[in-house]
């Protein structure tokens, strides 16, 4: 019996060694395949994407290539306040290459009559529509926002997007020269002090503060990065008399929605929309849009109170 047990133990040792060897070979093979797929993946040709879409873009954090397409052709008022394209009318496309495929996602600013044609164009090009809704209320003319997503070759995605946009009057080609003078100046220091965060001057009296979330956001295991539109955006537009208008959106998870809305209302800021922008984000995200007019410091304090209710990067 003792000899039998010893033989069994030796056989067990041999089997464990063989299993370990097989596991090691599998791990090495998987690593080689992964390295090979990364090494073999072509670097994205963003110049070709620019040519296909007809607009220049910029590489941003996380190797996201973002193309802005502001609706500079529109003259829109919100509650009688003329809004700048960089403040509330900014269509965009955010591309990110992963292996041999690219992902694009973004938001298109459209007049009501442009929505059906652009949507059909996106479908014809193999892209998906993930949301259509308003961001603000009392807009004249009325404007809708269409969110979309696509996967495949980056240049083909850009061509498909351009074809869809042909059903709208979205300006493509080289951006028009920015108008100089005339726009009230905005007190950026007041805003940054009230929020406790740095921002950036977008020009033409518009100032922006972007606040990423603290946790990782994914879609089907793929990271969704702040430059892809997955960050809270706080936009300020200078008005006469030292005042400012604010709009933008908070990126929230479910339990933050009501605390943020309550904080905004307590500070006199209107909540104008609560909805989703995507279909498969994890954790599930909700976007809260807002509007108010007041001094930059007062507005910043209200937005800070709302930000304090979120799991945002500090």
Regions found by a protein language model. Give the residues of each.
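Short, Lys/Arg-enriched N-terminal segments with co-localized hydrophobic residues
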Residues: 2-14
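Bacterial N-terminal signal peptides
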Residues: 25-36
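Long, contiguous binding/interaction regions
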Residues: 42-142, 149-285, 289-314
